[in-house]
Structure formats: C-alpha cells, structure tokens
Amino acid sequence: MDKLVIKGGSRISGTITASGSKNTSLPIIAATLLTGNGTFTLHHIPDLKDIVTFTQLLHHLGAETTYEGNTLKVSSRNVQSLQAPYELVKKMRASIYVLGPMLARFGHARVSLPGGCAFGPRPIDLHLMAMEKLGATITIETGFIDATIPGGKLQGGHITFPISSVGATGNALMAAVLAEGTTTISNAAAEPEIETLCKFLIAMGATIRGTGTTELEIEGCNTLKAIEFKNVFDRIEAGTLLAAAAITGGDITVNGVEPEQMKAVLKKFVHAGCLVETTDNSITLKSPKKLIPTDVTAKPYPAFPTDMQAQWIALMTQAEGSSHITDKVYHERFNHIPELNRLGAHIEIHKNQAIVHGPQQLSGTKVMSTDLRASASLVLAGLVAEGTTEVLRVYHLDRGYEKIEIKLNSLGADISREKYDEFH
C-alpha cells in the first residue's frame, strides 16, 4: 500500500495547469454506452484510479477502450453483457451511471448495488425513481438492481427530484435521450458537470433544453453518434491547489480553468484575505500575511461545493480566529477532523457544523485517509505542519487527484510516495 511522506514548511508557489475533471469524465464515459455507432475520442481525461475502474467495467460489458496521453477512445459497438458485477461496482459508487445508458439502449440492465447501500432512504433511490418515471420496472434481489422495460422502449415522463442530485440527474438525462417523447426534469442538478454532460449528449445528436438550469427538457431520439470531445477542467483540484498555496503563504497561478465556475470558492478566498485575479482561463492567488477566519456553508452549485469543505477546514486551522464550516449536502462528512486534530488542529463538531479554532501550529505525525477529499485535507495540513507527516491509505487520494504529489513538488513541496505494510 502507498503512503505520502510530507516534509512540511515549504511555500507552494508557481504556475500549474489543472487536470481534466473526474466528476465529468465518469458520466461522459458512461454515455458512450448509448450507441455502437462509431468510436468516441475523449480528450483531457485524467489518469485516475476511478477512470481505470470505469474502463474495466466497460471492458466487462464488451466495450473496447484505449487510453494514451489523457485521451480515451471508446467503442461500444460490441457491448453484449448487460450486467455490472459487484467486484467492479463496489470499488466506485459512480458505476451506477451505466444503469441509464444500458437500459435506454438495450431495454435491460442488471447493476450490482453499490457497496454500503442500506435499505431505506439512500441516494440510489433517486436513480431508480427516475428510471421508473420513464417506464422501467425495477426489482432488487440478491444484491442486484434489475431494470427492464415492459413496453420495450422507455417513455418520456416528468421527473421531479426531492433533493438535488448530480448522479441521479446524469442517469436520468442519459436514459431520457433515447426515450420516446419528451422528458422534463425538475430540480435537476445545475453543476457544471451536468451542463457538460448535456453538451456532450447534444453533440451526440440529442435535443436538450435548459442546459445549466434546474429545469431540463429532453426530446427523445432514435439514434446517437460517437463524437470527439474535450473534457472540462477539474474545479475541485483547482480549488485544492489554490488552498495549498494559501495555507503555506505562497502565490500560485492555475491555468486551464474557467473562473466563472469557481465564483463561490474564489469569493471565500478573498474573504480570507487572499488577493485573487482571474483571466478567461487562469486564476492567480496571492496569500496574505495572516489568514482571516471565514465561514462557509456547503450547498449545491452555484454555492460553495461540499467537495471543497474538507480542504477549507484544513486552511482555516491557520486563520487568526474561529471559523464555522457547515455542510448541508452531506451532514456527517467530517471523517477528516479527528485526523486533523491528531496533527494539532483544534476543531469541534456540532451536528453538521465544524468549528475551527486557529491559528494552530500543526506537528507532523501519521494520519489515515478515510475518503477522497479527507485525504486532500490531510495533505494540505502536512504541507504546513512542522516536521514530517505520513498520510496513509492514499489510494483514496489517487481516486480523484492526478499525480498530486508530482504537481505539488513542482510548486515547491517536498513529498515522496513510499510503500508500506499496513499490518506491520
């Protein structure tokens, strides 16, 4: 197993280019299952564990893929298997994205329940509800979602999500583009990742109105075509890199971005005392001498993203005073806090709010990654901690950050990747 060994105390400064978005890559790769007409060429696809897992799932279904230099080519011409097995789905909840495309194209899909799903209210219910609104029959047995279409073809319908869900909106879109008639989606997620998926489907030949809003209208079509497409930048990686500079007192320019998509995050950096300048495709951040404590509330886009909440908590450990961080998307997304406190942070949890008391001099020690964004917060803390920090179980980090230690080292960090035996 890999760990990152971080020698703290270096300023993160320089110029870097953002990677392609993981959260956009996964649904557009899933959308390649909608047609066997040609080969897709997808550019700016990041080299990540989740991308590898997803392409393995496509291979299992019968698709052919090649990946070289951040370009992924996919042909779904020979897809035959309609079952997504637990062995692959358990590695990544986003595997549920294959449900909509397979059901719409083939009339049947059998997808293992993602690991950790319990009966009762759970996020996957929204995906299943959307398929049922389009005429699918859903049964769950022996750990599998079995989806069929009694009428042979999905029918346009009206889908209203009780809460905003990026994943369920994406699945509904991919199913609706091949449905017969018109589908409307109310309270759709409006995140840039969904807007990009809409643009991808439109380029394939779909008709979608309301792109970028919470009300979508889709006219079903009979055939779609393979296309060449460039993925968008990863706004969470970009935000994490900005936070790395801010927490260490550095100055950074991140290229290859769309600042408009990061307005909520950039606004908070300004409130924290940073100087932020933007162009059409770059963000420059200059750190203040003292960080100002800044409260954030994570909510669906265009608000501050839940995927930046953990990194913001790490940053606020160095601010002069107390900050309140509230997560209204995932109320209990605070697994990183005990580990940050092990490094010397002073953070309290009250229900869905973290109270960060700063500034605290952090001291390096061993800490354990628990999930993707929690891992990023520990790396940020390690950059500013005194001494050496070892971040264990970085396979979580590798799921969503492309060569993060190489990028940070190019900006002045001292991070090495080492093997370790977790049981010794």
From Swiss-Prot:
Residues binding phosphoenolpyruvate: 22-23
Positions contributing to UDP-N-acetyl-alpha-D-glucosamine binding: 93, 122-126, 307, 329
Residues the record lists as 2-(S-cysteinyl)pyruvic acid O-phosphothioketal modifications: 117
GO cellular component, as recorded: cytoplasm
Pathway terms, separated by semicolons: Cell wall biogenesis; peptidoglycan biosynthesis
Catalytic residues, chain numbering: 117 (proton donor)
Keywords: Cell cycle, Cell division, Cell shape, Cell wall biogenesis/degradation, Cytoplasm, Peptidoglycan synthesis, Pyruvate, Transferase
Main location: cytoplasm
Stated name of the protein: UDP-N-acetylglucosamine 1-carboxyvinyltransferase
Gene: murA
